[in-house]
């Protein structure tokens, strides 16, 4: 199925949804586009200045063209969504908030693409709401826990945490230089836009640091529960990921019964951006078959 796709912009797809998590009310920002019968949700990672649009702007149009409604969600504590200091499981908080967003929008069942933290959050949602998940695509994330490939926290995570504490263009460049395999693709304009996003919400930066102090293990290790996931799952990883080592992806396909894995060479932690064309073809094919 192919749909006519007009120019899709961040501003033209922006909307807000109010959800409750226990006694707490969150105003959640989303980008919502496409009119397909099936919905694809995209969940971003935990980097400073991350948003649904910043993470996935190279991936929206191909999915809309393939006939899907696409929903990018800014998790609490990122982008235009409300701030939060989180002392529990960030994965499960995001999963609960996603359920609230889908309930408010009257969307019963979704496919979920999750990058890094978004992968952890997708797994949390799938475990809590198995009947509401079609398929999962997990990139550079899906569970917390140990790695045999690299000591934890990894080089990239140390740089990410340092950037939260001292947000500057120099620290941003240090992090982004190990975030992707080929840093020459990171233009000055892209770097400045990311820095501007960060500095526009200093409350998010400060709250992330406070959250880590309250609970250093923000992301749950779901290793013992992966066998409960019934959704067909595509795990995508960069061979050169210096944030979340590749053996975390191997743990996912070892645990999830109906899972497959694709590994991109010359790819860091941002497969959907670094290898966008191949990634988009792969995801459209996986969701459609």
Swiss-Prot record:
Q: What EC numbers are recorded for this enzyme?
A: 3.7.1.14
- Gene that this polypeptide is encoded by: mhpC
Point out the annotated site residues (description: Catalytic role in ketonization of the dienol substrate (substrate destabilization)). Answer: 194
Catalytic activity annotation: (2Z,4E)-2-hydroxy-6-oxonona-2,4-dienedioate + H2O = (2Z)-2-hydroxypenta-2,4-dienoate + succinate + H(+); (2Z,4E,7E)-2-hydroxy-6-oxonona-2,4,7-trienedioate + H2O = (2Z)-2-hydroxypenta-2,4-dienoate + fumarate + H(+)
Q: What UniProt keywords apply to this chain's record, in alphabetical order?
A: Aromatic hydrocarbons catabolism, Hydrolase
The protein's GO terms of the molecular function aspect are: 2-hydroxy-6-oxonona-2,4,7-trienedioate hydrolase activity; 2-hydroxy-6-oxonona-2,4-dienedioate hydrolase activity; protein homodimerization activity
The record's active-site residues are: 269
The protein's enzyme class = hydrolase
Q: Which Pfam families match?
A: Abhydrolase_1 (PF00561)
**What is any one GO biological process for this UniProt entry?**
3-phenylpropionate catabolic process
HAMAP family, per the entry: MhpC (MF_01654)
Q: How does it assemble?
A: Homodimer.
What is the organism field in this record? Answer: Cupriavidus pinatubonensis (strain JMP 134 / LMG 1197)
Please name the PANTHER family in this protein's record: ALPHA_BETA-HYDROLASES SUPERFAMILY PROTEIN (PTHR43689:SF8), HYDROLASE (PTHR43689)
- Quote the pathway field: Aromatic compound metabolism; 3-phenylpropanoate degradation
Q: Where is this site: Transition state stabilizer?
A: 116
Role summary: Catalyzes the cleavage of the C5-C6 bond of 2-hydroxy-6-oxononadienedioate and 2-hydroxy-6-oxononatrienedioate, a dienol ring fission product of the bacterial meta-cleavage pathway for degradation of phenylpropionic acid.
Q: Which GO terms describe its cellular component?
A: cytoplasm
Q: What is this protein called?
A: 2-hydroxy-6-oxononadienedioate/2-hydroxy-6-oxononatrienedioate hydrolase
Q: Which family does the UniProt entry place this protein in?
A: Belongs to the AB hydrolase superfamily. MhpC family.
């Amino acid at each position: 199925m192919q749909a006519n796709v007009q120019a899709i912009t961040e501003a033209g797809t922006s909307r807000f949804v109010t959800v409750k998590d226990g006694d707490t009310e969150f105003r959640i920002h989303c980008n919502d586009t496409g009119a397909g019968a099936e919905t694809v949700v995209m969940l971003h990672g935990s980097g400073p200045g991350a948003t649904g649009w910043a993470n996935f702007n190279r991936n929206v149009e191909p999915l809309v063209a393939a006939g899907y409604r696409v929903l990018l969600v800014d998790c609490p504590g990122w982008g235009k969504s409300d701030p939060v200091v989180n002392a529990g499981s960030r994965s499960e908080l995001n999963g609960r908030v996603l359920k609230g967003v889908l309930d408010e929008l009257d969307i019963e069942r979704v496919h979920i693409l999750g990058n890094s933290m978004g992968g952890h959050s997708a797994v949390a949602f799938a475990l809590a709401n198995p009947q509401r998940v079609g398929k999962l695509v997990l990139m550079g994330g899906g569970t917390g826990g140990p790695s045999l490939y690299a000591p934890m926290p990894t080089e990239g995570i140390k740089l990410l945490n340092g950037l939260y504490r001292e947000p500057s263009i120099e620290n941003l460049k240090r992090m982004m230089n190990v975030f992707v395999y080929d840093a020459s693709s990171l233009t000055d304009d892209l770097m400045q836009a990311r820095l501007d996003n960060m500095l526009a919400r200093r409350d998010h930066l400060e709250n992330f640091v406070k959250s880590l102090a309250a609970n250093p293990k923000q992301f749950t290790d779901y290793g013992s529960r992966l066998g409960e996931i019934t959704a067909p799952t595509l795990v995508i990883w960069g061979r050169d990921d210096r944030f979340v080592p590749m053996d975390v992806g191997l743990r996912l396909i070892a645990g999830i019964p109906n899972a497959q894995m694709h590994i991109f060479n010359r790819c860091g932690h941002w497969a959907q951006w670094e290898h966008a064309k191949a990634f988009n073809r792969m995801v459209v094919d996986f969701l459609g078959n």
